[in-house]
Amino acid sequence: MQDAPQEEDVPDVSALFPEAPPECHRTLDMVLRAGLKASFRLLPQARPRLEEIAQACDCEVDAIAQIALYKGKTSKKPYLVIASGKRTMKERALAAAIGEVLQRSNDEATMQLTGFAPGMIPPLGLTMRLPVLMDANLNRFAQIWCHAGTPNAFIRVSTALLARAISARSIKPDL
């Protein structure tokens, strides 16, 4: 296992990704601190559809991670759920994975717990560390595209290395 980069070893985000808006810097910085290699893409559309993202990033729609915040219905414990493309995570699959029914968090809770609005949550750079449930279908891809902190900014990272960096638990979404 590789040691995390030291402060002086982490490149300057704005120098490495000059096209990245400031809202993406925290995410990109955490990607670099996790030792991940990433590609960055800023799309011209303000809120691109999945098909537009796939075309611009030259990938399948299912290689785009859709990230949302859920909470336990009883415990209220928050979970970051990463789904593959247009797929949705079935409630019974989530419940089977953690032993509790989950419900999607509202916009205010999402913003408070992640630091990002719904629909643009990145996998890294959140305001707090959260348990992560990741769609096993994403493992079909060596690399996936994720939001980088704005609706039109994306990073491409290694699926396996990202899963390890965020301690994601792989689950089958359609039990």
Which residue ranges define each predicted feature?
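Extended, low-hydrophobicity, polar/charged segments
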Residues: 2-175
